[in-house]
């Protein structure tokens, strides 16, 4: 009985780890779609805003 409970516990733990990994991958892919990492216009705009802030 103890072995069964240990196997069941290990199986549940493994399932949770896999589920969390899948959720993390999904969140990352959704974030990448929503906020592209390489956005030259965003970089230029950020530089412009920072330079204006420093000059004031």
From Swiss-Prot:
What does the entry give for GO biological process?
A: regulation of DNA-templated transcription
Q: What does this protein do?
A: Antitoxin component of a type II toxin-antitoxin (TA) system. Labile antitoxin that binds to cognate MazF toxin and counteracts its endoribonuclease activity.
Sorted keywords for this record are: Toxin-antitoxin system
- Name the InterPro entries for this protein: Arc_rbn_hlx_hlx (IPR013321), MazE (IPR048242)
Q: How does it assemble?
A: Forms a complex with cognate toxin MazF which inhibits the endoribonuclease activity of MazF.
Name this polypeptide is given? Antitoxin MazE
Q: Quick check: keyword Isomerase in the entry?
A: no
Q: Could you tell me the gene encoding this protein?
A: mazE
């Amino acid at each position: 009985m103890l072995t069964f409970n240990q196997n069941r516990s290990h199986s549940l733990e493994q399932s949770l780890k896999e589920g969390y990994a899948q959720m993390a991958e999904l969140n990352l892919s959704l974030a990448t779609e929503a906020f592209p990492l390489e956005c030259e216009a965003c970089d230029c705009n950020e530089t412009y805003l920072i330079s204006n802030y420093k000059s004031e």
